[in-house]
Amino acid sequence: MPQDRSLQLNQAIEAAILQLQQSPTPEQLAHTLTVVRRCMQAGGQWIVAVEPVPGAGQVQPRVVTTADGARWWYAFTSFEEQMKSPDTVKSTFLADIDKLFAAALSAPEIAGIIVNPWHCTLQLDKELIRIIRPGLAD
C-alpha cells in the first residue's frame, strides 16, 4: 500500500480517537472501532516498536506495562506519534493491522495493543480486537 494511503487511513483513526476522548460514549467507541476495522480492511498499517529477543536473533514487539500490571504491545499511527514516546524507540517496523491483531490474540502474555500510548491513545484489549476482527481466536 502506498505510504500516503496508509497515512490517510491512520489520520482517520487519529480523528476518531480524538472524538472518543472528547465524548467517551458507547456510540463513539463503536464508531472508533468501525474506523479501525475499515482501515484494517483497506490494508492499513501501524508502526510497531520492536526489541531484540536475547540470544534468539529475532525481534518481538516492545511491551508497556500499565499501572494495573497488565502488559500491552504498542503501536503508532504516525512517526509524529512515535516521537512523543518518553523512551527512545530504536527499532520499528510497519505491520499490517490485521496481522498485528492476530499475533496479539495468540500471545497469552499480553492484554492487547495500545495505539499511540503517549497521546491520542486507544487501548484495545483482546475483547475489542475480536470485535474489530471477528473470526480471530486466541
Predicted features and spans:
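An interfacial alpha-helical scaffold signature
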Residues: 1-138
